[in-house]
């Protein structure tokens, strides 16, 4: 019987010594939203609580300024 190996989650922001997550950094923010536009939870990404709050705030600001979409493209 094969053993399933789960890779340990780690916080990328802690590893890179990020002080604050910027709402203008769209490339980073896109990694933390789903295809439908939802914010990915920290239990999936491994992000620490401090950075998850900053991430959510930055994504919401970017959405408000139309830098990120609220939802997907709704292609039919």
UniProtKB/Swiss-Prot annotation:
The keyword tRNA processing does not apply. GO terms for cellular component: cytosolic small ribosomal subunit. One of its GO terms (molecular function) is small ribosomal subunit rRNA binding. Gene3D superfamilies: Ribosomal protein S18. InterPro entries: Ribosomal_bS18, Ribosomal_bS18_CS, Ribosomal_bS18_sf. It holds the Pfam family Ribosomal_S18. GO terms for biological process: translation. PROSITE patterns: RIBOSOMAL_S18. Keywords: Ribonucleoprotein, Ribosomal protein, RNA-binding, rRNA-binding. The keyword Lipid metabolism does not apply. Belongs to the bacterial ribosomal protein bS18 family. Part of the 30S ribosomal subunit. Forms a tight heterodimer with protein bS6. NCBIfam families: S18 (TIGR00165). Binds as a heterodimer with protein bS6 to the central domain of the 16S rRNA, where it helps stabilize the platform of the 30S subunit. This is Small ribosomal subunit protein bS18. It comes from Aeromonas hydrophila subsp. hydrophila (strain ATCC 7966 / DSM 30187 / BCRC 13018 / CCUG 14551 / JCM 1027 / KCTC 2358 / NCIMB 9240 / NCTC 8049). The gene is rpsR.
């Amino acid at each position: 019987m094969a053993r399933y190996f789960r890779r340990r989650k780690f916080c990328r922001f802690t590893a890179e010594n990020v002080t604050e997550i910027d709402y203008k950094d769209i490339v980073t923010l896109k990694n933390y939203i789903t295809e439908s536009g939802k914010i990915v939870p920290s239990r999936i990404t491994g992000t620490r609580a401090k950075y998850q709050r900053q991430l959510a705030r930055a994504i919401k600001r970017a959405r408000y300024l139309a830098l990120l979409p609220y939802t997907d493209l709704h292609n039919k």
